[in-house]
């Protein structure tokens, strides 16, 4: 698989959630330092060369607490795939979005699919952020590992769309994902990449 920073992390997450091994080409590791550190903390086995990054989690995933930030921190575009990984980690994880408002609008879809996720307006899992004195929902507590189920969900944007695909990949039944065009807008030839990961997607 190949991709930029967002794509690289997304496909690393896809490989880990499927309990397989994934190799990502074409993204410099210095743009993924925080992501790689986070995945390793969760139990991923990472191998890095000048050409590619390989990840697997044969022993499963551990929970973590992560707050988003601007580069070189854990960038906000990674948090949606991470949220799905958290649903499959054994224990309680915390995600704290500190950069943009309304970045947790995809959570109801994951809840519908069986994810045990609660959202809060409080700052959790990190220092107080600029949303701390607002009513903006920007933190989530995720309890895993959850057995996800197939569902009919609508994907509001590219990041939410990819998280829905990841959740569907480990669900016990097929899912109907609406708004698939968002993924095509944000990822290069995503259906070919999904096929290489062993996912079966039929377009309606």
Q: Which role does the model predict for each range below?
A:
Residues 1-204:
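Short, structured segments at the rim of ligand-binding sites
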């Amino acid at each position: 698989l190949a991709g930029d920073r967002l794509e690289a992390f997304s496909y690393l997450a896809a490989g880990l959630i499927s309990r397989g091994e994934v190799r990502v080409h074409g993204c410099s590791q210095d743009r993924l330092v925080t992501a790689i550190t986070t995945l390793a903390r969760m139990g991923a086995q990472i191998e890095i060369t000048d050409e590619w990054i390989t990840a697997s989690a044969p022993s499963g995933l551990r929970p973590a607490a992560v707050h988003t930030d601007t580069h070189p921190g854990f960038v906000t575009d990674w948090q949606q795939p991470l949220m799905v990984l958290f649903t499959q980690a054994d224990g309680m994880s915390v995600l704290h979005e500190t950069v943009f408002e309304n970045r947790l609008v995809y959570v109801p879809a994951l809840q519908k699919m069986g994810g045990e996720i609660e959202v809060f307006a409080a700052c959790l899992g990190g220092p107080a952020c600029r949303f701390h004195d607002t009513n903006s929902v920007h933190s989530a507590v995720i309890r895993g590992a959850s057995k996800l189920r197939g569902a009919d969900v609508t994907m509001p944007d590219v990041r939410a769309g990819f998280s829905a695909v990841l959740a569907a990949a480990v669900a016990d039944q097929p899912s109907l994902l609406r708004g698939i065009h968002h993924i095509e807008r944000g990822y290069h030839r995503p259906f070919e990449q999904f096929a290489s990961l062993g996912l079966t997607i039929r377009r309606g």
